[in-house]
């Protein structure tokens, strides 16, 4: 029977662990029209922003979120928008609200979402 050196076994074991870690690492994936456009490692507190045109108000909205790995979802941290209306936050108890130029800004919102659908 042939004996293999320990360094060969360690190399094989290391390669297996590296491959498994790629497949077992949680990822944050963004898809547009069924195509994957972004995929990054999903780590706690990973910040990201979503910029879109509000469907009712037809004005720009910027939302700042982070990954919440304890609850397996997302926290909405702040939002910035140009007009008041349906679907936009306005209650003072929901965060720190201020007007800045043409924009309304809500900070420290800490709203939790299990999933995000941008359709």
Residue ranges and their predicted role:
Residues 15-17, 51-54, 82-84, 116:
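Intrinsically disordered, low-complexity segments enriched in polar/charged residues with Gly/Pro
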């Amino acid at each position: 029977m042939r004996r293999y050196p320990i360094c060969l076994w360690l190399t094989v074991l290391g390669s297996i662990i590296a491959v498994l870690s790629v497949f077992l690492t949680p990822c944050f994936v963004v898809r547009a029209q069924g195509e994957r456009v972004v995929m990054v490692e999903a780590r706690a507190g990973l910040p990201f922003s979503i910029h879109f045109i509000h469907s009712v108000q037809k004005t720009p909205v910027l939302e700042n979120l982070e990954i919440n790995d304890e609850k397996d979802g997302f926290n909405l941290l702040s939002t910035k928008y140009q007009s008041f209306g349906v679907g936009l936050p306005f209650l003072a108890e929901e965060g720190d609200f201020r007007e800045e130029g043409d924009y309304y800004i809500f900070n420290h919102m800490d709203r939790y979402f299990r999933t995000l659908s941008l359709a």
